[in-house]
């Protein structure tokens, strides 16, 4: 089953969040990007557990734009291995989904 729309999650340093969110919307790679300013992340990196304050971007977009969105974000993202993951939208408000189509 193919899904037309997806939600993309991107973690980033807090000071980079707005720049990346603006890039996504300005390039019409996402209809909307929400910024959750501060999350606590705990993860494995280079053999040890790390803890950081990060921001979480939540992007609503079309699935066919994901690869382009990923490549554009990787160009400006400061992390060596940025989290850029997509989850399908399996159902939603039809008016909102239409707005995604019209906005990106």
Locations of the language-model features?
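Positively charged, small/polar-rich N-terminal and surface patches that mediate targeting and assembly
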Residues: 1-104
